[in-house]
């Protein structure tokens, strides 16, 4: 009996150990809060992968820069410290000019235009990341960008001297062009930076404004709808290749669904975010004709600069986009 019992226990152990060893666990850091629609979409993506693989691939989402800060995420995925990660394309424009294409003011100002720009640029962007051992899974836009300011702004002249949050090379360049002071502040630090007076203005979406409770310290939002920057979820190519074919298929299928869902949610929530800002006492308004014209001139100058930096490849992407 003892021999039989030992055999049963040993078999049970082997079965349990085998199941455990067959399970793969991945970490996915993101810089945004758990309540943000991007993060919620990523959590849904992870759940779909878990279900499709029968629990063999578990993806742990680390929100609000709890595992890596925004500027660290891409390198962490490249180095295998995290298997996946979410990054903002425009944050890496200094590394690769093409990454800044959706941060050029007024190049694409609606969801329809943003989708055309993504279709025109996707293959090139994917190829650039592939050279770094990274694979694009899905990319989702933020709502259109507008100007938050403690100061009333009727023209670019009113922006001189503002302490301007810069989250990307493009937003830093805007600050320089309008005579503001660019200050690098990550999304997770915005609330504190506004409360302490480290910054008094920024250009970002209604979503970020709502998430960071900008309305507690800032009263003006000018809905310039200047551009729709995208986040992208990337995976370490070696980690992806280590999966069996069925798991790879599950990841890609869930990623395609997440991209479709993310674009729909982003567009659907755009108006809702602005309504929440209004309900919390903010003045949400269209830019004055003068401010709009001034910002368009800045956009034209920045597009010319970007085309010089990105060379023939950048021009080809913009030309393809404009023909769509």
Question: Where would I find each of the regions flagged by the language model?
Answer:
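N-terminal secretory/targeting leader peptides
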Residues: 23-113, 121-324
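Bacterial N-terminal signal peptides
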Residues: 8-18
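Bacterial N-terminal signal peptides that target proteins for export
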Residues: 1-9
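Short beta-strand-centered segments that line the small-molecule binding cleft or hinge
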Residues: 116
């Amino acid at each position: 009996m003892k021999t039989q019992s030992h055999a049963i226990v040993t078999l049970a152990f082997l079965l349990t150990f085998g199941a455990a060893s067959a399970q793969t666990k991945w970490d996915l850091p993101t810089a945004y809060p758990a309540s943000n629609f991007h993060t919620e979409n990523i959590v849904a993506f992870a759940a779909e992968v878990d279900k499709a693989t029968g629990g063999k691939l578990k993806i742990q989402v680390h929100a609000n820069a709890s595992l890596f800060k925004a500027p660290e995420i891409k390198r962490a995925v490249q180095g295998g410290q995290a298997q996946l990660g979410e990054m903002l394309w425009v944050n890496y424009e200094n590394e690769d000019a093409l990454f800044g294409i959706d941060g050029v003011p007024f190049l694409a100002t609606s969801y329809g235009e943003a989708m055309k720009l993504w279709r025109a640029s996707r293959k090139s962007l994917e190829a650039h990341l592939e050279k770094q051992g990274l694979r694009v899974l899905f990319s989702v836009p933020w709502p259109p960008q507008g100007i938050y300011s403690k100061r009333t702004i009727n023209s670019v002249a009113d922006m001189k001297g503002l302490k301007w949050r810069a989250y990307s090379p493009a937003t830093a360049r805007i600050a320089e062009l309008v005579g503001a002071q660019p200050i690098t502040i990550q999304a997770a630090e915005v609330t504190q930076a506004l409360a302490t007076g480290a910054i008094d203005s920024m250009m970002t979406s209604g979503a970020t404004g709502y998430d960071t409770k900008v309305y507690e310290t800032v009263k003006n939002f000018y809905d310039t709808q200047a551009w729709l920057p995208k986040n992208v979820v990337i995976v370490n190519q070696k980690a992806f290749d280590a999966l069996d074919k069925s798991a790879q298929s599950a990841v890609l299928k869930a990623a395609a669904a997440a991209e479709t869902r993310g674009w729909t949610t982003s567009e659907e929530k755009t108006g809702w975010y602005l309504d929440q800002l209004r309900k919390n006492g903010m003045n949400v308004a269209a830019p004055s004709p003068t401010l709009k014209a001034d910002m368009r001139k800045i956009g034209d100058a920045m597009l010319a600069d970007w085309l010089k930096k990105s060379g023939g490849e950048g021009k080809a992407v913009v030309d393809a986009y404009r023909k769509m």
